[in-house]
């Protein structure tokens, strides 16, 4: 279901999008603050107001919780155990896509850490978010990364026509849960199509998971999201392997995450996963 349709359905069922907006943004945590000060050259005393203004503009585009609660500032890619490999490979020429990148904040982490920006790709359904990312990081004049507004399931999108078989790494963070289980399988297969058809092609995921799926999916009547537990996550990739004939090595871990600790649902945690083509 398209996010606009999801929101419309949720509102009809009594959901108030404004409930996702928090006014309690009083500081910008690391590493986002350092990136905004040193990469974007924003004076320290102006960082907080700069972020608040951007947050308000973005929430008007679409009321995602990650925007309303400013969790897009909680950069997470560097906390993945796969990050050293991802960074090293991009430095050596591999191409990495952040799928559902929002403002491209994780890509700026890679660039700040020395990744050549021209080897990085970001895609989001909403072109406004890609533009807002350029405003957030003030790098419109010099960043060489490739930003593509696209629906990952649209066969005719620029993402598909330009990048099928061309990528080496795809990073997916806080994205898959907005789809139901069967659609997640379609997305996973599409991502595999985008990757180079060779051993070592890599998907790295950060997934909202729940120890008790009954609790995690109890909000479906209002927000039709699908929260995995470990068993369902493994089942997803087993299905993908069965349907594609590909052999994948799937490694999972529980990832310490500030966003999960603040989540209102009981038993929510952040599931990290790497899916490597063999």
UniProtKB/Swiss-Prot annotation:
EC nos: 2.1.3.-
InterPro entries: Meroterpenoid_MTases, SAM-dependent_MTases_sf
Residues that coordinate or bind S-adenosyl-L-methionine: 124-125, 151-153
Molecular function per GO: methyltransferase activity
Presence of the UniProt keyword Transferase in the record: yes
UniProt-listed Gene3D superfamilies: Vaccinia Virus protein VP39
Top-level lineage group: Eukaryota
UniProt KW keywords: Methyltransferase, S-adenosyl-L-methionine, Transferase
A Gene Ontology BP annotation from the UniProt entry: terpenoid biosynthetic process
Result of knocking out the encoding gene: Drastically reduces the production of andrastin A.
Pathway entry: Secondary metabolite biosynthesis; terpenoid biosynthesis
Keyword check for S-adenosyl-L-methionine: yes
Family per record: Belongs to the class I-like SAM-binding methyltransferase superfamily.
Subunit note: Homodimer.
Function noted in UniProt: Methyltransferase; part of the gene cluster that mediates the biosynthesis of andrastins, meroterpenoid compounds that exhibit inhibitory activity against ras farnesyltransferase, suggesting that they could be promising leads for antitumor agents. The first step of the pathway is the synthesis of 3,5-dimethylorsellinic acid (DMOA) by the polyketide synthase adrD via condensation of one acetyl-CoA starter unit with 3 malonyl-CoA units and 2 methylations. DMAO is then converted to farnesyl-DMAO by the prenyltransferase adrG.
Protein name: Methyltransferase adrK
Organism: Penicillium roqueforti
Gene designation per UniProt: adrK
